[in-house]
Design a protein with these regions (language model features):
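Short, intrinsically disordered, charge-balanced linker/junction segments flanking boundaries
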Residues: 1, 7, 165-168
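Acidic, Mg2+-coordinating active-site environments of NTP-dependent enzymes
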Residues: 3-153
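Glycine-rich phosphate/pyrophosphate-binding beta-alpha loops
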Residues: 138-141, 156-167
Length: 168
């Protein structure tokens, strides 16, 4: 029985529709990640993606929202250009500047917020989280700069699997 201490759902956009057929089926499949979690465990969810965040209604784990757009009462978010975590007691921990991330794109800021929340609520020291975010340069085939010629950037994003990924 799969039962993670910390789970996450980053978004819910049309992808893998050949397998799932409908968005409802796809959402249900993603929600399986937290199906067996207990109230003392965590599920990190994208507050800005309302379709995704609606899945939280059926989650027994503590839902930890993240947002790149709004300051939250609890969770990971950007405040004054800084990635911060606000815990259950309302204490705010500054992690690092959003501009210190080495990977481009708003979706990567969202990924960083989710990773930050998972690490923080998993007990990782905030300085370790900050250094990891500052030093992570991405993965092969994902917005990978191959060359720049006469001001034109050539980017390998062959791991992108849907239009939403290409747009972001």
């Amino acid at each position: 029985e799969f039962k993670p201490e910390i789970s996450a759902i980053l978004n819910l956009t049309p992808d893998h529709m050949d397998r799932h057929k409908t968005m409802e089926c796809y959402g249900a499949a993603k929600a399986n990640v937290f199906r067996n979690q207990d109230p003392d465990q965590y599920c990190v969810m994208n507050y800005d993606d309302k379709t995704c965040f609606a899945l939280a209604e059926n989650c027994r784990a503590k839902v930890v929202p993240f947002s790149r757009k709004e300051e939250l009462d609890f969770g990971a978010f950007v405040k004054d250009g800084r990635i911060v975590i606000k815990d259950e007691n309302g204490d705010v921990t500054d992690i690092c500047g959003a501009d210190e991330l080495q990977i481009p794109g708003m979706h990567n800021l969202e990924n960083a917020l989710a990773a930050c929340a998972m690490a923080y609520f998993g007990g990782i020291d905030h300085e370790v989280i900050a250094e990891t975010l500052r030093s992570f340069r991405g993965v092969e085939h994902r917005i990978e700069l191959c060359n720049e010629i006469d001001g034109i950037r050539f980017v390998n994003d062959s791991k992108g699997t849907n239009p939403d990924a290409a747009i972001k």
